[in-house]
Amino acid sequence: MSSDLQGRNAVVFGVANKRSIAWSIAQGLHAAGMKLAITYQNERLQQEAKDLIASLPGAEGFMCDVSKDAEIESLFANLKERYGKLHTIVHSVAFAPPEELRNDFVNTTREGFRVALDVSVYSLIAVARAAAPLMEDGGSIVTMTYYASEKVVPRYNVMAVAKAGLECSVRYLAYELGKKKIRVNAISAGPIKTLAARGISGLGEMLKNHEERAPLGRNVEVAEVGSTGVFLASDASSGITGEVIYVDCGYNIMGF
């Protein structure tokens, strides 16, 4: 399935540590033969990211705060110079101020709302716009969403609104970039103990609930999400765009 990825170039946004979904996808893409550019948000995350990147021969690291247009533009100018063409973009970026995930949704602040949608949604649009000129042979853009975009998950709050906006953005980007043979899809993973997920109140209860209700009787493993990312990057998924692919052990199909 992944042999067609040999020698292609990918950019992975959102690697925080070895437990992150972005890292699992990066490992899979590297194993499939892709050349990787891996970004980290700031200096605080730089050392851990660099240690991880060093474990993937040939991979390079770049600092990029996706809430700043100038940094996105600078990154892609650098990538154009170093790689020429890009084939895959992995966008695994989401953030809301911690207090917005603890308070009642009705008390969401204007600033918290703005930050959540800017970082979690607009960044995908900004990255896609910057990447498209380098994806002249077509390619795949993959982002990460969650079931709370459709149904109420207590305390997911404004992040659920952001995920709904992200999924809508996926459809519009898929429509507009389709003429360039660029596919855009989202993976909706079940809850996983990642750095980002730890900021959500009641994560333990979410994991327990998923395990009890999912048809497969367990929670999804991060490696399974990583494999799905590789699939969406590969030509095996060449007819799939504008979709939300669930990797949640079937939890989303349950009605009770």
Predicted ranges, named:
Residues 3-38:
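Canonical Rossmann dinucleotide-binding motif of NAD(H)/NADP(H)-dependent dehydrogenases/reductases
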Residues 14-21, 94-129, 137-179, 191-193, ...:
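Catalytic loop of short-chain dehydrogenase/reductase
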Residues 30, 84, 135-136, 175-180, ...:
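A short hydrophobic alpha-helix cap/turn motif
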Residues 50, 179, 189-214, 254-256:
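A glycine/serine/threonine-rich, flexible loop-to-helix segment
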Residues 64, 68-73, 77-82, 91-114, ...:
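Conserved mid-core segment of classical short-chain dehydrogenase/reductases
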Residues 178, 183, 240-242:
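Short, small/polar-rich loop/turn modules that mediate ligand/substrate recognition or access, typified
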Residues 214-225, 236:
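A conserved structural motif in NAD(P)-dependent oxidoreductases
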Residues 229-230, 241-256:
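Short C-terminal tail/terminal secondary-structure segment
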